[in-house]
C-alpha cells in the first residue's frame, strides 16, 4: 500500500490495488518479509489469511451493494406513484453506487484473487479510470442532491421555474464532471514489468509520478476533489438549511403564541359565501413535512458517506505527508478492513432510501411473487395509515358555527384555502 517515491520506483509493499488512488493500490496481504533491502521490489509472497479476509469482505460488499441498489431501481421503476425530483436523484445516486460496486469493488475483488494484475496495458488504464470515476460520481451525485434540497427549502420559488430541467442538468453535470476529472488516470497508471527477489519477472498495474512531489500532489488533489471539497459544500448547504428551518419554526411558534388569546372560531378561520376560509402560510415561508423528511434522509446519507470514507482518506494523506510512515507497520487486519469498508457507503444508501420512503420498500416487495404475503401486510398498513389521516382531517375541521369576517387583502403574505362546509 505504498507510493512510489520516484518516476519509476516500485512500491515497497503490496500490489493488488483496492486503493484506487495509490500506485499499486492496497493488497495489504503482502508480508513484510517480501521486501528487499532498502525498499527494493517486493518478493512474490503475501499473507494468504489476510488475503482471504480481504476477498471475503469485498465479496460481501459487492453482493449487498448490487442487491440493495438494484432493488431501489426496481422499486422506482415499478412504483405506481408519480415520480418526484427526489426520486430522480435517488435513481441516479443508486446508479452511482452500482458504478462503485462494478467499477471499483469488483476489480479490486478480482485483483485480490489473482494477486497480480493480469491484463494488457489498456485494461490497466481503463480499470484505474473507472475506479476513480465511480468515486467522483458517488460524491458529486450526493452534492447535487443536497443542493437540490437547499434550493427547495431556502429558495422555494425557484422550484417553480422548470425544476425538472434544472435537476437533469445538475445530474448530467455531475456525471460529466466525474468522467472528465478521472481522465488523468490514463496517463498516470500503466502496466510495469519488474524483477522480484527470487529473480523472476512480474508485472503489475502501477503509477508513475515525478519525484519528489508527484505522489503528494496526486493524493492531495484526489482527496480534495473526491472528499474535502464535496464535504465543505455539503456542510455549507446543510448549514443554510438548518438555519432556514430554525427560523421557520421560530416564526410559527411566535405566530401560535400571538393567536393564543383569540377565540377558537376566529383562529379556525372566518366564512365567506358558505366556505370556510383558513389562512395558511405561503410556500415562501413554510416548509412542508415532505421537504423535512427528504432533508433528514439526505442528511443521513451524507453522514454515512463521511463516516465511511473519512478513514480511507486519512490513511491516504498520512501515508504521503508523514515521512516516517511505513506501510508494513500498519498492514494488519484492522487497518485493512477499515479501508476496505469505505465502499460500505454504497451498501448503506439503499436501506436509507427505503427507511425514509416506506413505499419504495413496499413497491420493491410487490415486484416479487414469492413475497405477496409481505406485500399484503404493507398494503394493509398503508390503508390504515390513510384512514387515520382522513379521520384526523375530519376531526380538525372547524365547527360550522364559526364566526368572523372575511377580507381579501392583496398585501397579505398568506394564501387562502377554501373548505366547503354544510350550512
Swiss-Prot record:
Using the UniProt annotation, give the residues that carry a glycan (glycosylation sites).
27, 198
**What is an annotated GO biological process for this record, any one?**
positive regulation of cytosolic calcium ion concentration
The alphabetized UniProt keywords are: Cell membrane, Disulfide bond, G-protein coupled receptor, Glycoprotein, Lipoprotein, Membrane, Palmitate, Phosphoprotein, Receptor, Transducer, Transmembrane, Transmembrane helix
One Pfam family here: V1R_C
Residue numbers spanned by region Disordered: 1-23, 382-423
Q: How does it sit in the membrane?
A: Multi-pass membrane protein
This protein's record includes keyword Cell membrane = yes
Report the locations given in the UniProt record: Cell membrane
Compositionally biased spans, kind Polar residues: 388-406
Residues bearing the modification Phosphoserine? 409
Disulphide-bonded residues: 124-205
A single GO cellular-component term on record: endocytic vesicle
Keyword Cell membrane among UniProt keywords: yes
Lipid addition sites, S-palmitoyl cysteine: 370-371
Bilayer-crossing regions: 53-76, 89-110, 126-147, 169-190, 221-241, 299-318, 337-356
Extracellular topology: which positions?
1-52, 111-125, 191-220, 319-336
- Which of the residues are on side Cytoplasmic? 77-88, 148-168, 242-298, 357-423
UniProt record similarity statement: Belongs to the G-protein coupled receptor 1 family. Vasopressin/oxytocin receptor subfamily.
Q: What does this protein do?
A: Receptor for arginine vasopressin. The activity of this receptor is mediated by G proteins which activate a phosphatidyl-inositol-calcium second messenger system. Involved in social memory formation.
Q: Which protein are we looking at?
A: Vasopressin V1a receptor
Species this protein is from:
Mus musculus (Mouse)
According to the entry, what is the taxonomic lineage of the organism? Eukaryota, Metazoa, Chordata, Craniata, Vertebrata
Protein encoded by which gene: Avpr1a
